[in-house]
């Protein structure tokens, strides 16, 4: 029997990232490969109490189907927090709750793009966005950055050359580089985007995890034509197992997204939404975020210190002010995948570069994550990687 699968499914390429993740799942492996939050950061006891409050209250509503836009009190809480942290001017009418921000990526690509359309992404970019957009079978154009954000001259050139339907960026502590866009670059970017009237996805999963400096405003602050769709998530500041994210956008976009949501999965789990909102109302979210910041900052500092102490000077890296990642650049004669194979033999792993690019020929970069290991383990793992690097640079 010949089973015929859809074109988007047939177009999915096998990624050996999954094979790498299987290898690093070994119990004695030091893994800097994942982008997971630390399990000790989850407020498990508080979640237990919030769950009891929900079930002892209106359990029927919590266990029933819910509205496709999401639980209204949670949408209100998200809008208020965004207004305070990233200086937006949202109400609940600007918010739609998603099953994690990954669903938001899928929905927004479906909203704006057809097969063969052009999407601009940073070079490098978040691999989860690339894979989500691939399901719509779009074409990618990569825009390089300079440590302050997208290079504006390259952005303008791409917009003048291509019929661009969508732009995807991570402005705060980007995955994989850890770089944050400056305030000035955000303003320059939106000035150009508003001129060409192209929708923008501003993905911000790590924005609250700032270890020094001040929070920077969302692109919506500089958006004069309501083109920005902001993606947020509770996965890094609450618990990823709840699968709660959101899209913040102008009411027209939200109206269209609501139709998409109704036809995709009816709604995000009402029970998860109500437990999260009950937790927000009964516990100190700000204090919880600060505890996560304290934990991750110490681990980031430990990794940066170990890199500076052990890595050969030919290997450079970023210095993130927040988030979860450090991006390393090898001398061009080295390939990160070859280095990874040798590192795995020494029971330490990272993610090589290829998954973060839509173009070929990017082989001398790798991403390190510091959120899931204690400081002693981080130091040990970095020293193991350094030994491999030194051997390959002799």
Residue ranges of model-derived segments:
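N-terminal small-domain helix-loop-helix segment of the aminotransferase-like
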Residues: 10-100, 107, 281-282, 349, ...
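Conserved glycine-rich beta-strand-loop-beta hairpin in the small C-terminal domain of fold type I
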Residues: 277, 294-304, 316-329, 339
């Amino acid at each position: 029997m010949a089973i015929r699968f859809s074109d988007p499914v047939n177009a999915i390429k096998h990624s050996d990232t999954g094979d790498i993740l299987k290898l690093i799942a070994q119990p004695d492996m030091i893994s800097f490969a994942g982008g997971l939050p630390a399990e000790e950061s989850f407020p498990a006891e508080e979640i237990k109490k919030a769950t009891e409050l929900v079930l002892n209250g209106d359990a029927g509503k919590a266990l029933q189907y819910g509205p496709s836009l999401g639980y209204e009190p949670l949408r209100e809480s998200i809008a208020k927090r965004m207004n305070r942290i990233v200086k937006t001017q949202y109400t609940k009418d600007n918010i739609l709750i998603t099953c994690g921000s990954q669903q938001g990526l899928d929905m927004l690509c479906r909203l704006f793009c057809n097969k063969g359309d052009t999407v601009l992404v940073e070079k490098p970019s978040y691999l989860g966005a690339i894979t989500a957009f691939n399901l719509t079978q779009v074409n990618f154009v990569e825009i390089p950055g300079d440590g302050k954000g997208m290079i504006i001259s390259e952005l303008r050139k791409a917009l003048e050359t291509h019929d661009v339907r969508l732009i995807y960026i991570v402005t705060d502590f980007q995955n994989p580089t850890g770089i944050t866009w400056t305030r000035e670059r955000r303003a320059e970017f939106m000035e150009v985007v508003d001129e060409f009237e192209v929708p923008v996805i501003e993905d911000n999963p790590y924005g609250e995890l700032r270890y020094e400096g001040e929070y920077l405003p969302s692109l919506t602050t500089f958006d004069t034509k309501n083109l920005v769709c902001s993606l947020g998530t509770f996965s890094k500041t609450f618990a990823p197992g709840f699968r709660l994210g959101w899209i913040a956008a102008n009411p027209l976009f939200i109206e269209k997204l609501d139709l998409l949501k109704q036809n995709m999965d009816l709604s995000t789990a009402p029970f998860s939404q109500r437990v999260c909102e009950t937790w927000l109302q009964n516990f100190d979210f700000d204090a919880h975020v600060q505890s996560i910041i304290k934990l991750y900052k110490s681990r980031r500092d430990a990794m940066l210190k170990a890199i500076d102490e052990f890595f050969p000077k030919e290997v450079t890296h970023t210095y993130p002010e927040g988030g979860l990642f450090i991006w390393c650049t090898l001398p061009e004669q080295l390939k990160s995948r070859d280095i990874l194979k040798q590192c795995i033999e020494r029971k330490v792993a990272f993610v090589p570069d290829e998954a973060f690019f839509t173009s070929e020929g990017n082989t001398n970069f790798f991403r390190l994550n510091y959120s899931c290991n204690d400081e002693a383990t981080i130091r040990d793992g970095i020293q193991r990687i350094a030994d491999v690097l030194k051997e390959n640079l002799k």
